[in-house]
From Swiss-Prot:
UniProt biased composition (Polar residues): 583-593, 1582-1599, 1639-1648
Residues with the Asymmetric dimethylarginine modification: R498
Tissues and organs where the protein is expressed, per its UniProt entry: Highest expression in brain. Also expressed in kidney, pancreas, lung, heart, liver, skeletal muscle and placenta.
Listed Basic and acidic residues bias regions: 1653-1663
Subunit structure of this chain's protein: Interacts with CTTN/cortactin SH3 domain. Interacts with STRN, STRN4/zinedin and MOB4/phocein; this interactions mediate the association with the STRIPAK core complex and may regulate dendritic spine distribution of the STRIPAK complex in hippocampal neurons. Activation of glutamate receptors weakens the interaction with STRN and STRN4.
Protein name: Cortactin-binding protein 2
PROSITE patterns named in the record: ANK_REP_REGION (PS50297), ANK_REPEAT (PS50088)
Any one of the GO BP annotations: regulation of synapse organization
Molecular function terms, GO-annotated: SH3 domain binding
Length: 1663
């Protein structure tokens, strides 16, 4: 029966037994008993036992019902109604074999199937019931957690309410401050509206001026049109008359020939002799023409008049091109010809050639060709004297005219120069200059003006004589009439100037005739219009200089041009422009600094206390037995506890049990807060009120205290940093300080984790377990190291904490510190001797952890930080400098000291097989990978478990780094060869400079190497010649081959790889990498082409003078032979001249000529006879009888400023200009014999003058030489120092240009600004002889990290060079107008007290404005070096008070007129005529009053030293009693410099001592004390120092009136305390003018005491 029910789905074709066997076989196939585990077998056994018991029960029941069931089965279902049942019965009865199955299903099999299904359902239900029970358990746990969260929510809500209350108070305070600030904003807005209104007024005035200017332009255009019309009529009439004249001349000539012919025929007939007609007619015509001119010249004075309005034209008809000769009366000697006389056209600009032969043939006149024009250069050179205007545009230059073509008429206006905006500028070509024509005007008008402006007794404007033969001036009165004729000529010129004045209506310069705006232009003027005169004065006696001849001005051109309506671009943008007699100053440059100072002063007020994240209760530490009285007070300013990323300890959720009696033990001392971090509590009153509100009454009440919750309270006190509560709890007996909460956190762990150093110290002193670990194995040291609390780490280490303790995962404190990038903790642990090679369970080392975070500093400390020998830790700066220099190269200590970690640690692989290099490369941490690669034992080819190398997993940047791992870094140097000795001014020039390091890899080819060298040179040249600090990466995007200085790869002469010569593009058999390794090439040297090759590239690189300018200088020397270089002292004149001479010498030698350089130094005793001997001995002067040699001589005359040029060179000017045997000159030798000499044409003469401008009689020499002026404010000198210092910095950094914010760049920029500001101030003071060239600043030291070295060098330069030159220059200027008895030398040797005071004031102003201003050193360090500068202790207030004590109120306006006048040019020693009367009157008053005061105040003449006392007593009348107008004007210039905003503010840098007292402008307050009584604010000494440019006060007794609507600026000068009450009530403030109202001091006061105190209350600036 049991087997029959084994099959649930019987098969009709098989017996039940077979079905059961098939089911058993299927069950065997489904699972194998052998594979079951022990528990599974037990379960199977239990199931099978239950199955057997169930089967037994079924069997018993079936046996009881057996009989009934069989009867029912066999017979109960058969009836007559169902024929199918009968068929079944018959089937079963008839079938004999057992193979047939019954027709219907066996009931037992059905029962078995039902039982199996029920068992399956029972199993499913049991599984679902178990799952439901587990879900019910989870639900219960979640309910418990929800309840806990609700309780926590209630607590947080209560805290939030408290925080809201506190925040509400803070918000009220902020609202109050906002109201105050809004009031200030309204005030500032009102001020802004006022300023904008003034600006609108100025704009309206400017628009009106523009309209007037446009109207004037229209009128001038109309007048020009009229003049053009008239001139065209005149031209027509002239041409008609000229044609008629030519016809008459031809007819006259024919008649003369016929007459001569007839006379000859008559003579022949008379004589009756037979003569042969051998002479041809043209020959006789030519001879007769010569005779005619000769007779005209000898008989009467003849003049050749050439029309100026016609251009050069040539025709085949030579008869019409002869100059017209007409007689002039000898008695008058007038250089002018009557208006009816018409001249002919000049054939060439250089036709006339002064000669001895009176009869110059026509062929000689025509033979001269048109001179070639020098190509216009990108950089213009001012060659013929100082230039004060803008450089003309070379693009408008007219090309040279061919000799056989007539230029078109439309080209004539293009000849005019482009400098209509500029003052007079000297010509660029020598010996003489051309007169400028204004652009936009018709050349005929210019010609008319030019004609009346010339001087007929001089050579013409181009230095050429006329085309007619020269004739002697036979009139004895001609020279006497020169002045009258000159005045007449000037009158006509002024009349014509109405139509030829420049378009830009610039006012003419004061003190100069109105026609002084005539400029000059480049050599285009060679083909321009000109006037020819016949009469010529003998060269031995120089003619008087025409007043308007450019290049011959009697007054040297000033270094700074007059300010016009269009300000010159060379001036600074904040320079005040003089427009319509009103001075408009731009915004002062000191505003940003002023804002910064104000922000610093408002800092204590604006920085409100930072609120802690939790409320706090201050617990005051009291002695034993005292009650706690300040428990409930709130400390708003407490710092929040620094717990970044940390969870609150679990034990803090417990309820509090507060004792009712608290006693203090005197053994627990309060811990100072000085050792706490900024994030920790900064006092003993630390935060403690994060608990329930019942803390205060419980603590204040008495009674016994239960000890049940004390460990929990201890945990909270330690976690929150409550030192007071912690010390109270530690004093109780029976308290377990090592108690751990559920997470295993002890009180020491919580304190260390949160960084509470004081709490850690208290717990450690109470003998808490220092190595107590939590449930994860982390000790307090691990927690502190992970959170970066280095002070706690240091404290725990000092208490012998286990520094190598490993947590459950193997993490040590060092590993945790590296993982979080806490380098202070890493340093402390390393110095304590921790093990760097401890590995975690995953195989990670601290190196893996540091690299994984990408922290370079941590990795460097791990690899390079050594354990101190005696336990002294390295200084932080030393350790950083020793390991943090990535690009130091050979200078880096890493290249000297080896890494301290072994190679095994660097190459250690973790569980996945990854080394630290794998991690760094895969994450793209290039810096970390570079540090790892520097370790010699790194194995970059090591593979991980996936068979990948470091290169396989690296990013692109890291792959590039790995590829360059074995690359050779070869430094690339530029060499300029040998530099000449230092006497040529080249002692500061460097021979070699390292520009970069080339990376040569194994796969680098020679083509790639050539491209790299060329690109590196190009980038370097562009970087050093740029305007800003460029790095090599910034330059690579620029594809231009030439730099601003003209150097490129084409400037290379040769390249050496080590010692092997190589050229760009050359290839060797070996690769560059193998070649460098084999030849051991340590450097690559590039040699530039120099003078030896006839090039100037090396000179350009050594001196930083652009190559185009050097080539232009060389062209001038080759073309004109006589060139003089002049400029301020130190402008490298000697170096430039010597290098040009060398280059010229080698060029001549290459051309096959022998050449020699002769150098002579000129001193005060150098005489004309010595110069003559030099010329004769060097074969420059050759006797007339001797034939010239082919040898070429270069003569260099140095230091010509030490002698008088006019006396030294006067006799040599004529033969130097005309070098031929036809113009000899007689010289007398030392033996008394005289002989005729002439200058050799192959002689080159170059001279140097260390003087900014020529003066006096030296100007007579100017027209005979080509002059090259080296101005300090123009190229090449202007940018030379900047380029030179930038190259020095690049060389110092091994080719790597630092960033602009680098201290080295700042100190170099400061040195550069010192040179520029110094020269700017000296030019304003009118002392051009004190100007300095850049040579003195080339030795500026560049020491990275030591800016003090540069400041010390600057002090030596100031004391040794600058200050003596300034003193000498100011004394010489102040002594110019002394009496004859008191000469200049006497004044220099024995200067008066006034002169000494002026010198001291000038030195102090220059030092503060030009030198100390802008120094990047901190104020404290700068004050230490200020004492090294001489002249810095003079009080600047003396300059402000000068000349005011002697004035009455009525004289204030007159002083204003003087002060607001245009600044005098530096080159003029005489005052403008309109300025003299006022100054001379004031000077006499000052002199008289000062003499009286000298007698009355003789006892006050001594001055207390500033070093002994801060108070300075001065008798101003006695100290500044000046005796000349020039001194008075010099002092006024100093006053304007003190208050000028166009220069840097003097008040920013003052004495290091507090000798200047500054106040804010008091507006309309009558007395300054009333202002001080307002809102006060104590400031520190740093804020009292005169760094702020706006804490000033203006005091004056005179009326505060404005001139021409321009308001006055407040004074930046200090105010004497004794005269504080003299502030005027009507003082006004403004920032639109650079003039200053001066302090007026009563005459009756004998002395003014300048008391200065450090701790004074100053009024806050009212911004």
């Amino acid at each position: 029966m049991a087997t029959d029910g084994a099959s649930c789905e019987p098969d009709l074709s098989r017996a039940p037994e077979d079905a059961a066997g098939a089911a058993a076989e299927a069950a065997k196939k489904e699972f194998d008993v052998d594979t079951l585990s022990k528990s599974e077998l037990r379960m199977l056994l239990s199931v099978m036992e239950g199955e057997l018991e169930a089967r037994d029960l079924v069997i018993e029941a079936l046996r009881a019902r057996r009989k009934e069931v069989f009867i029912q089965e066999r017979y109960g279902r058969f009836n007559l109604n169902d024929p199918f049942l009968a068929l079944q019965r018959d089937y079963e009865a008839g079938a004999g074999d057992k193979e047939k199955k019954p027709v219907c299903t066996n009931p037992l099999s059905i029962l078995e199937a039902v039982m199996a299904h029920c068992k399956k359902m029972q199993e499913r239900m049991s599984a679902q019931l178990a799952a439901a029970e587990s879900r019910q358990k989870k639900l219960e746990m979640e309910k418990l957690q929800l309840q806990a969260l609700e309780q926590e929510h209630k607590k947080l809500a209560a805290r939030l309410e408290e925080e809201r209350g506190k925040n509400k108070q803070v918000v009220l305070m902020l609202v109050k401050e906002c109201k105050q600030l809004s009031g200030k904003v309204i005030e500032e807005a009102q001020k802004l509206e006022d300023v904008m209104a003034k600006l609108e007024e100025e704009k309206k005035k400017t628009n009106e001026l523009e309209e007037e200017l446009s109207a004037e332009k229209r009128r001038s255009t109309e007048m020009e049109a009229q003049m053009e019309k008239q001139l065209s009529e005149f031209d027509t009439e002239r041409e008609q008359l000229r044609a008629k004249l030519n016809r008459e001349e031809a007819h006259t000539t024919d008649l003369k020939e016929e007459i001569d012919k007839m006379r000859k025929m008559i003579e022949q007939l008379k004589r009756g002799s037979d003569s042969k007609p051998s002479l041809s007619l043209p020959r006789k015509t030519k001879d007769r023409r010569l005779v005619s001119i000769s007779v005209g010249t000898e008989g009467t004075v003849t003049r050749s008049v050439a029309c100026q309005t016609d251009l050069v034209t040539e025709n085949a008809d030579h008869m019409k091109k002869l100059p017209l000769t007409m007689p002039v009366k000898p008695s008058t000697g007038s250089p002018l010809v009557s208006a009816n006389a018409k001249g002919s056209v000049c054939t060439s600009a250089t036709m006339a050639r002064p000669g001895i032969d009176r009869q110059a043939s026509y062929g000689d006149l025509i033979g001269a060709s048109v001179p070639a024009f020098p190509p216009p250069s990108a950089n213009k050179i001012e060659e013929n004297g100082p230039s004060t205007g803008s450089t003309p545009d070379p693009t408008s230059s007219t090309p040279p005219l061919p000799s056989n073509a007539a230029p078109p008429t439309a080209q004539t206006p293009g000849i005019a120069p482009q400098n209509s905006q500029a003052p007079p500028m000297h010509s660029l070509h020598s010996p003489c200059a051309n007169t400028s024509l204004h652009p936009g005007l018709n050349p005929r008008i210019q010609a008319a003006r030019f004609r009346f402006q010339g001087n007929a007794n001089d050579p013409d404007q181009n230095g050429n004589t006329t085309q007619s033969p020269p004739s002697r001036d036979v009139s004895p009165t001609s020279r006497d009439n020169l002045v009258a004729k000159q005045l007449a000529r000037n009158t006509v010129t002024q009349a014509l100037s109405r139509f030829t004045s420049p378009q830009a209506g610039a006012p003419s310069r004061p003190g100069v005739p109105p026609t002084g705006d005539v400029g000059t232009h480049p050599p285009v003027g060679r083909t321009s219009l000109k006037t020819h005169g016949v009469a010529r004065v003998d060269r031995g006696n120089p003619p008087p200089i025409p007043p308007k001849k450019p290049g011959l001005s009697q007054t040297p051109s000033p270094p700074h041009p007059q300010l016009k309506v269009i300000i010159d671009s060379s001036r600074a943008s904040n320079t005040g422009a003089k427009v319509d007699n009103k001075t408009v100053a731009s915004t002062p440059s000191s505003l940003p600094q002023g804002n910064r100072v104000i922000n610093e002063e408002n800092l204590p007020k604006s920085s409100s206390p930072q609120l802690p994240p939790k409320p706090s209760i201050d617990l005051t530490v009291a002695p034993a037995g005292c009650a706690v009285s300040a428990l409930a007070t709130s400390q708003v300013g407490a710092w929040p506890a620094a717990t970044p990323g940390l969870n609150q300890p679990a034990c803090s959720d417990s309820s509090l049990v507060i004792p009712t009696t608290i006693a203090f033990c005197s053994s627990i001392n309060p811990v100072s807060a000085s050792s706490c971090r900024p994030g920790a509590s900064d006092s003993l009153l630390v935060t403690a009120s994060g608990w329930s509100p019942s803390l205060t009454p419980l603590l204040m009440s008495g009674g016994p205290a239960p000890l049940a919750g004390r460990p929990t309270l201890l945990q909270q006190a330690a976690a929150q940093g409550n030192v007071t509560l912690l010390s109270m709890l530690l004093n109780e007996e029976g308290l377990d300080i090592n108690y751990s909460c559920e997470d295993g956190h002890s009180a020491l762990y919580s304190a260390a984790k949160n960084g509470h150093t004081d709490c850690v110290r208290l717990l450690l002193s109470a003998e808490a377990q220092v190595n107590a670990a939590d449930k994860n194995g982390f000790t307090p040291l691990c927690a502190a190291a992970a959170q970066g609390h280095f002070e706690c780490v240091e404290l725990l280490i000092s208490y012998d904490a286990n520094i190598n303790h490993a947590a459950d995962g193997g993490q040590t404190p060092l590993y945790l510190a590296c993982k979080n990038g806490n380098k202070e903790c890493i340093k402390l642990l390393l110095e304590a001797g921790t093990n760097r090679s401890v590995k975690t369970t995953d195989g990670w080392t601290p190196v893996h952890a540091a690299v994984d975070t990408g922290n370079v500093d941590s990795l460097k400390l791990l690899m390079y930080h050594r354990i101190p020998a005696h336990g002294n830790s390295f200084n932080e700066e030393e350790s950083e400098s020793s390991v943090f220099d990535l690009d130091g190269g050979e200078e880096s200590p890493e290249g000297i000291s080896k890494p301290v970690v072994p190679a095994d640690l660097i190459n250690h692989a973790n569980r996945e097989g990854w080394t630290a290099a794998h991690i760094a490369a895969s994450k793209g941490f290039k810096n970390c990978l570079e540090i790892l690669c520097r370790h010699g034992g790194l194995e970059p080819e090591r593979r991980d478990k996936c068979n990948r190398t470091v290169h396989d997993v690296a990013t692109d940047d890291c792959k590039h780094l790995l590829e360059n791992l074995n690359a050779l870094k070869i430094p690339l140097r530029i060499s300029v060869g040998e530099i000449e000795p230092s006497n040529y001014g080249s002692d500061d020039l460097e021979c070699e400079n390292t520009i970069c390091a080339l990376n040569i890899r194994k796969q680098t080819s020679w083509d790639d190497f050539s491209k790299a060298v060329s690109q590196a040179l190009t980038n370097h040249f562009q970087a050093i010649s740029s305007d800003g600090w460029w790095s090599l990466e910034d330059v690579t995007c620029n594809n231009t081959t030439d730099s601003n200085i003209g150097l490129s790869a084409r400037s290379i002469r040769s390249i050496t790889l080590g010692n092997v010569p190589w050229s760009v593009g050359q290839s060797f058999a070996q690769s560059p990498w193998d070649f460098m390794r084999k030849n051991k090439a340590e450097h690559i040297t590039v040699l530039l082409s120099g003078p030896q090759e006839g090039c100037l590239s090396s000179v350009t690189y050594a001196s930083m003078i652009p190559l185009q300018m050097m080539q232009n200088y060389l062209r001038l020397v080759e073309q004109y032979h006589n060139v003089i270089f002049h400029g301020p002292e130190g402008s490298l004149q000697d170096y430039i001249v010597h290098q040009l001479a060398l280059c010229l010498k080698h060029r001549q030698m290459a051309a096959g000529f022998s050449c020699e350089i002769v150098r002579a130094e000129v001193d005060a005793g150098f005489s004309k006879e010595q110069l003559l001997d030099l010329f004769i001995s060097s074969a420059c002067l050759i006797p007339v009888k001797q034939s010239p040699s082919k040898k070429k001589i270069i003569i260099i005359l140095e230091n010509l400023e030490k002698s008088s040029l006019s006396e030294l060179l006067r006799d040599f000017l004529a033969p130097l200009e005309n070098r031929s045997t036809e113009s000899p000159c007689t010289f007398q030798k030392g033996n008394g014999l005289s002989e005729c000499y002439y200058f050799h044409e192959n002689c080159f003469l170059m001279g140097t003058i260390a003087k900014a401008c020529l003066q006096g009689s030296d100007l007579l020499v100017q027209q005979h030489f080509r002059w090259v002026q080296l101005r300090w404010d123009g190229e090449p000198m202007q940018g030379l120092l900047q380029r030179f210092l930038r190259r020095k910095v690049v060389n110092k950094f091994k080719g790597q240009a630092p960033s602009p914010c680098d201290p080295v760049c700042k100190i170099v920029d400061w040195a550069l600004s010192v040179w520029r500001q110094l020269n700017s101030c000296l030019a304003r003071l009118g002392t051009p002889e004190a100007l300095l060239g850049p040579k003195y600043f080339l030795s500026c030291p560049v020491v990275p990290g030591h800016a003090q070295v540069t400041v010390k060098w600057m002090s030596k330069l100031w004391n040794g060079v600058i200050a003596p030159r300034v003193q000498e220059a100011i004394l010489s200027r102040a002594s110019v107008k002394r009496q004859p008895g008191f000469g200049q030398t006497t004044a220099k040797r024995h200067p008066s007290q006034g002169q000494q005071a002026v010198v001291k004031a000038a030195l102090s102003i220059l030092l503060n404005k030009a030198v100390l201003h802008g120094c990047p050193l901190p104020r404290a360090e700068l004050d230490q070096h200020t004492a090294d500068f001489k002249g810095g202790s003079f009080p600047l207030s003396i300059v402000s008070s000068y000349n005011t004590c002697n004035k009455k109120k009525g004289e204030s306006g007159a002083w204003r007129k003087v002060n607001t006048s245009p600044r005098r040019k530096s080159g003029r020693f005489s005052l403008p005529t309109w300025n003299k009367p006022d100054l001379s009157t004031e000077g006499m008053k000052n002199k008289t009053i000062s003499q009286l005061n000298c007698n009355r105040n003789a006892s006050l003449s001594k001055q207390k030293s500033l070093e002994n006392d801060l108070s300075l007593t001065l008798n101003l009348d006695q100290r500044l009693s000046l005796g000349s107008d020039d001194e008075a004007d010099l002092v006024k210039e100093l006053q304007s410099m003190c208050s000028s905003k166009s220069e840097s503010d003097i008040s920013k840098i003052a004495d290091s001592r507090d000798d200047l007292r500054m106040f804010d402008s008091s507006g309309n307050n009558p007395v300054l004390s009333a202002t001080i009584n307002n809102l006060r604010m104590p400031v520190s000494q740093k804020e009292v120092s005169p760094l702020s440019s706006h804490q000033t006060t203006e005091c004056s007794n005179s009326k505060s009136k404005t001139e021409l609507g321009v308001s006055r600026v407040k004074s930046f000068l200090p105010v004497p305390r004794s005269k504080v009450t003299q502030c005027s009530q009507n003082t006004k403030r403004s920032s639109s003018s650079s003039n200053t109202r001066q302090i007026e001091i009563n005459n009756n006061s004998k002395e003014v005491n300048w008391n200065l105190h450090k701790n004074e209350h100053l009024e806050k600036p009212n911004k």
